[in-house]
Amino acid sequence: MSAQSARRCSWSPHLAFDAAITPNLRRWVTGDDGSLTARLVAASERFRVARLLQRPQRPLADEWQVLGQHDRTPALTREVLLICDDIPAIFAHTVVRQRHARRDWPFLRGLGERPLGGRLFVDPAVAREPFQFARLLPHHPLRQALQRVLPAMAPLPMLPARRSVFRRGDGVMLVTEVFLPDLLSRPSPGTEAIPYPRYLRTTDRSPSTHTTETKKETTR
C-alpha cells in the first residue's frame, strides 16, 4: 500500500455491511442528520467534551479538496472526544480553511471544551450536506490520531465513521465522527431528531475556559 493510499479511505453515501457493525451501532452511525451530541446526552447520565487539539495543520489527503483548497495548505483543525459516563464514545475531527474560520466560523476560536453542536444546530445560517460513511482501518491517519490518545483502540480492525460538510456564508467546515466501541452496547435513542438541549447552547459571550459536563439530574 502506498503512503498516499494509506491516507485515504472510501467514503460512500451508504454504510457498507460489516459483521462488526451491530444493528445498535448502525443506528448510531446512520441516525438522523441532527445533533449527535443531543443523542449522546439523551443516552447517558453524564456527558462532557475533552478537547485534544485545536491548531492549524495540513488537512488529510481526502479532505483538502472538500474544503475547496487547491493544495494541502494548513487548515484550522479541532479534535475532541465526546465522553459518556466517563467512557469515550466519539472521536470528532473538524477542519476549516483558516480564512473561513475567521470570517464565517469566528466562534471556533473560543469554543474550548464546549460542544461544536452548540453553535451549528441553533444557527439558521448553517446548512448541512448529506452524510458520507466509511470504515476506518488502523493505518488511516484519524485512527492513528485516536490511537495516540487511546492506545486500546489500536487492535480493533475497523471503526465506523461518518462525515458531513457544513456551510455558513462562503465558509466550508468538514466534520468527521469516528464511532467507538462504547456505542456497541449503549442503546441508541432512536433515529428521529432530538432537539438540541438548551443548556448546551453557546453564545459568543460564553467564556472560552468553560468545560461542558452535563448530568441528567441537574437538567430540565
UniProtKB/Swiss-Prot annotation:
List locations, semicolon-separated.
Cytoplasm
Its recorded reaction(s) are: chorismate = 4-hydroxybenzoate + pyruvate
Q: Which UniProt keywords apply?
A: Cytoplasm, Lyase, Pyruvate, Ubiquinone biosynthesis
Specify whether RNA-binding is a keyword of the entry: no
Which pathway does the record list? Cofactor biosynthesis; ubiquinone biosynthesis
Q: Which domain of life is it from?
A: Bacteria
- Tell me the name of the encoding gene: ubiC
Q: Which family does it belong to?
A: Belongs to the UbiC family.
Q: Which HAMAP family does the entry link to? A: UbiC
GO MF term list: chorismate lyase activity
Q: Which GO terms describe its biological process?
A: pyruvate biosynthetic process; ubiquinone biosynthetic process
The residues that the entry says bind substrate are 78, 116, 177
Q: Where is this region: Disordered?
A: 194-220
Query: Which Gene Ontology cellular component annotation is one that this UniProt entry carries?
Result: cytosol
**Name of this protein:** Probable chorismate pyruvate-lyase
Q: E.C. number, please?
A: 4.1.3.40
- What exactly does this protein do? Removes the pyruvyl group from chorismate, with concomitant aromatization of the ring, to provide 4-hydroxybenzoate (4HB) for the ubiquinone pathway.
Species whose genome carries this gene? Cupriavidus necator (strain ATCC 17699 / DSM 428 / KCTC 22496 / NCIMB 10442 / H16 / Stanier 337)
Entries under InterPro entries matching the protein: Chorismate--pyruvate_lyase (IPR007440), Chorismate_lyase_/UTRA_dom_sf (IPR028978)
